[in-house]
From Swiss-Prot:
Subunit and interaction comment: Monomer.
Protein name as annotated: Outer-membrane lipoprotein carrier protein
Coiled coil: none
GO annotations of cellular component type: outer membrane-bounded periplasmic space
Domain of life, source organism: Bacteria
Main location, first listed in the record: periplasm
SUPFAM superfamilies attached to this UniProt entry: Prokaryotic lipoproteins and lipoprotein localization factors
Organism name: Histophilus somni (strain 2336) (Haemophilus somnus)
A Pfam family matched in the record: LolA
Lineage: Bacteria, Pseudomonadati, Pseudomonadota, Gammaproteobacteria, Pasteurellales
Name of the gene this protein is made from: lolA
Subcellular location: Periplasm
HAMAP family on file: LolA (MF_00240)
Signal peptide: 1-21
Role this protein plays: Participates in the translocation of lipoproteins from the inner membrane to the outer membrane. Only forms a complex with a lipoprotein if the residue after the N-terminal Cys is not an aspartate (The Asp acts as a targeting signal to indicate that the lipoprotein should stay in the inner membrane).
Keywords linked to the UniProt accession: Chaperone, Periplasm, Protein transport, Signal, Transport
C-alpha cells in the first residue's frame, strides 16, 4: 500500500512540474511578442477587505530584454527603472534614491519578469495559468509579495498586472493607450539627481 502511495505522490509531483513548465512557456511566448511597449496606466490600491484606499496614474515603458521603467505621476511622483543590472527607485517627495542589483530584488519585484527570459529568474516563482491570467507566486518565504498576476492575451496584448502583498493589500495596474514605438535605451538609464540621499544597497 505504501508503495502505491509513494508512486501516486511521485506522479502528482510530475504532473505539477509539467503544469508549471507549460504555464511558464505559455507566458514567456506571449511576453516575447512584446519587443517594446509604452502605455499609460491607472492604479487601484485596495486593502485586504477589498476596499479601495487609493487611486493613481502614470506611464510604463518596456523593452526586451531586461529594460523596464515606471513613472508614477499621481497621487505622488515616483520612478522605478531597471537598466538590466540595477533596479533604481526614486522618491522625489523624500528626495531619496535606492539602488539594488536586479538579481537581489526578484522575489519582491516581479515586474522584472515582464522583460526577462532568464531561466534563473523564472525558477524563483511558481506559475499557474487561468485563461489569459497568469498567477505568479514567489518561492521565497521572505518575499513581501504574496503573488503577482499578469493578464496578457494570446497575441501579446498586455491588459493589466497586479501585486498582492502578504498583508492582503492589492495594487492593480490597468494599461491604456498602448503603443509599440522605438524606444532608445537611454530612456532606461537613471541619472542621480543632485542633492538627494542615495542608498546604494549594491555595496552591502
Amino acid at each position: 500500500m505504501k508503495k502505491y502511495l509513494n508512486l501516486t505522490a511521485l506522479l502528482l509531483v510530475g504532473i505539477s512540474n509539467v503544469t508549471w513548465a507549460n504555464a511558464v512557456n505559455e507566458l514567456q511566448n506571449r511576453l516575447n511578442k512584446i519587443d517594446v511597449l509604452s502605455a499609460d496606466y491607472t492604479q487601484q490600491v485596495t486593502d485586504a477587505q477589498g476596499k479601495k484606499i487609493q487611486q493613481g496614474s502614470g506611464k510604463i515603458q518596456l523593452k526586451r530584454p531586461n529594460l523596464f521603467r515606471m513613472d508614477n505621476e499621481t497621487p505622488q511622483e515616483s520612478q522605478i527603472i531597471a537598466d538590466g543590472k540595477t533596479l533604481w527607485f526614486y522618491d522625489p517627495f523624500v528626495e531619496q534614491v535606492t539602488a539594488n542589483w536586479v538579481e537581489d530584488t526578484l522575489s519582491d519585484t516581479p515586474f522584472v519578469l515582464l522583460t526577462s527570459n532568464n531561466p534563473s529568474h523564472w525558477q524563483q516563482y511558481i506559475v499557474e495559468q487561468k485563461s489569459d491570467t497568469f498567477i505568479i507566486k514567489p518561492k521565497s518565504k521572505k518575499s513581501t509579495i504574496k503573488q503577482f498576476n499578469i493578464r496578457i492575451e494570446k497575441d501579446g496584448v498586455l491588459k493589466n498586472f497586479s501585486t498582492i502583498e502578504k498583508d492582503g493589500q492589492s495594487n492593480l495596474y490597468i494599461l491604456r493607450k498602448i503603443t509599440n514605438p522605438a524606444l532608445n535605451d537611454a530612456i532606461f538609464t537613471f541619472t542621480l539627481p543632485k542633492g538627494v540621499e542615495f542608498d546604494d544597497q549594491r555595496k552591502k
